[in-house]
């Protein structure tokens, strides 16, 4: 699912490290989390939409890998992102 530009830019501004930052792990995790939340709502209504389910699983895996990377490189930033996005971590 594609996010509206205004929602995407709000997330970018909230999590960016500097003015030109659009691709840091924090930003990517925030955008993926919003897409996952929206697609989860879609899946509640359309349980048999296998193509969307596959995309959802891929997004969850990508976010998990980005979270692992962020945890290894900048643990303080990792904790901040997890708290801001209300993510459950093991």
Swiss-Prot record:
InterPro entries: Ribosomal_uS15, Ribosomal_uS15_bac-type, uS15_NS1_RNA-bd_sf. GO terms for biological process: translation. One of its GO terms (cellular component) is cytosolic small ribosomal subunit. Keywords: Ribonucleoprotein, Ribosomal protein, RNA-binding, rRNA-binding. PROSITE patterns: RIBOSOMAL_S15. Belongs to the universal ribosomal protein uS15 family. PANTHER family: RIBOSOMAL PROTEIN S15, BACTERIAL AND ORGANELLAR, SMALL RIBOSOMAL SUBUNIT PROTEIN US15M. One of the primary rRNA binding proteins, it binds directly to 16S rRNA where it helps nucleate assembly of the platform of the 30S subunit by binding and bridging several RNA helices of the 16S rRNA. HAMAP family: Ribosomal_uS15_B. This is Small ribosomal subunit protein uS15.
